[in-house]
UniProtKB/Swiss-Prot annotation:
It comes from Bacillus subtilis (strain 168). Transmembrane segments: none annotated. GO terms for cellular component: membrane. It comes from the Bacteria. Pathway: Spore coat biogenesis; spore coat polysaccharide biosynthesis. SUPFAM superfamilies: UDP-Glycosyltransferase/glycogen phosphorylase. This is Spore coat polysaccharide biosynthesis protein SpsB. One of its GO terms (molecular function) is CDP-glycerol glycerophosphotransferase activity.
Length: 474
């Protein structure tokens, strides 16, 4: 474990212990904080450089004790002893990342979409507006909780984290939001008979409150895996009854962090189902939109922020490959920040290179490319599910992200080596076959479920006794 993460878990544990008795409607407010967002860039540097910033090594948390520490506190939430009901499943819209087709497969009589906005229906499912419930429900006063938080932090004025004004400001800003979310979700459970809740992440306030309220009310909660598992803070601890994952890599990772095997469900993610059943864009339209030639090979490069040197090296390595046509798909963060100069410069130098922001969807591109390049993005997985060879660049930085390491010879430290091998994959049948074998082995282990929505329905029925599938979609 890195110095930063060792410090992080010691600090997080101390925070949860300090705020354990600050509870509203039985829920500890300290568990709702998305804690890593409280850590300033300056404090992060200190945590990386000073391994014992928050205590000696003997105070560090063993990797396998991370989830048990939080699980004990989650299980200690006092239950309301409500009788189990065969009620609805609530789909929390934020971060769920379902396709429309995913929503249409749920039974409207047994399902509701919980969203920030207000509409009568979404994909034929009734919508429950968080804002409307929040406006109409009885509201708690956050003032006393803010005062208690201030008094709890008062002895820590000189503490590197708890004494940091930015840390305190973020917490004090969040506490009224915690109270509102608890009131809203509590009112939701009073309004509806709920057997299960599905969330797309446990990072945001409402998803976490939904999970903790399910624990209090005796309902089932499932958190889907929202992306490639590339960092502890966004995925652990698990707050839901069950954590759904893509495959074996994530299942083993969560178990190493102390999750119980029965807490992990290998379901894939419903949004990937469209890879197997979506009708692709017409081929002639694809080539016309990009002004590409059908006789030449196409490479997709899906970029990642803060990796300009790596992608620059790959593009430089391909600059003399006139037989290749290149699609650069920048990361959404790069598009939002307009960090695209490197890619536009590359497009000028290469006769057939296109920078695609939002003009075409990823799933319009992947059926027609011959290979894909990325680093830590789920695009690597998605391209492999589209049966394309994938080459992975190792990300820079002081953290290791081994998700794609089982690809072996098709994961690279150096961009020039990746570019060279990419050309060989497209030129040599033998090298292409090796890439295909690596792809097949990766998918067999790390995404074995081709029909994720069906797997999710099966798990929901097993856990609640209710079949939530829309009858006419069977």
């Amino acid at each position: 474990m890195s110095a930063y993460l060792s410090n992080y878990w010691v600090l997080y544990r101390k925070y949860v212990e300090l705020f354990d008795k600050l509870r509203y409607k039985g829920i500890p407010l300290g568990l709702i904080s998305n804690f890593y967002q409280y850590i300033s860039p300056e404090l992060r540097v200190m945590m990386e450089e000073e391994p014992e910033l928050f205590g000696s090594v003997d105070q560090h948390i063993d990797e396998g004790q991370i989830q048990p520490f939080f699980e004990e506190r989650i299980q200690n939430i006092v239950k309301t002893n409500d009788e189990p009901v065969k009620g609805k499943v609530i789909l929390h819209f934020d971060y769920l990342r379902f396709s429309n087709e995913n929503y249409y497969q749920f039974d409207p009589e047994k399902t509701a979409v919980l969203a920030r906005w207000s509409l009568p229906h979404y994909c034929d499912l009734p919508v429950i507006s968080k804002r409307e419930i929040a406006d109409s429900c009885q509201k708690g006063d956050s003032k006393q909780y803010l005062e208690t938080a201030c008094s709890l932090l008062a002895p820590y004025d000189d503490h590197p984290a708890f004494g940091d004004q930015a840390f305190r400001d973020r917490l004090f800003k969040d506490i009224p939001l915690f109270i509102e979310a608890i009131d809203t979700v509590d009112a939701l459970f009073e309004q509806e008979k709920i057997s299960a809740v599905i969330v797309g992440t446990a990072e945001d306030i409402y998803s976490r409150v939904l999970a903790l309220m399910c624990q209090r009310k005796g309902a089932v909660s499932i958190c889907l895996q929202h992306g490639a598992l590339m960092g502890d803070e966004a995925f652990i601890p698990v707050f839901t009854t069950y954590q759904a994952v893509f495959g074996a890599y994530e299942a083993e990772w969560f178990i190493r962090k102390g999750c119980k095997p029965e807490q992990i469900l290998v379901t894939g993610h419903p949004r990937f189902d469209q890879i197997f059943n979506r009708t692709p864009m017409d081929m002639s339209i694809f080539y016309r939109k990009l002004a590409f030639q059908p006789t030449k090979k196409i490479v997709l490069i899906a970029t990642q922020p803060f990796s300009e040197d790596f992608y620059s090296g790959v593009l430089q390595g391909l600059s003399d490959q006139k037989q290749l046509q290149i699609i650069i798909k920048p990361h959404p963060w790069e598009i939002g920040k307009n960090k695209l100069d490197l890619y536009h410069e590359a497009a000028k130098k290469h006769q057939a290179c296109r920078v695609i922001k939002k003009e075409l969807e990823l799933y319009d591109l992947l059926p027609y490319v011959d290979a894909a390049v990325t680093q830590t993005s789920t695009v690597g997985l998605e391209a492999m599910l589209f049966q394309k060879p994938v080459l992975i660049g190792k990300s820079s930085g002081n953290r290791s992200y081994p998700y794609y390491e089982s690809l072996g010879d098709f994961m690279f430290d150096q961009p020039d080596e990746l570019a060279h091998t990419l050309v060989e994959v497209l030129r040599s049948p033998d090298v292409h076959q090796k890439a295909e074998e690596a792809r097949l082995a990766f998918i067999a282990a790390n995404y074995p479920v081709a029909e994720s929505t069906n797997a999710l329905f099966a798990e929901l029925k097993a856990k609640t006794g209710v079949d939530y599938r829309r009858e006419d979609t069977e």
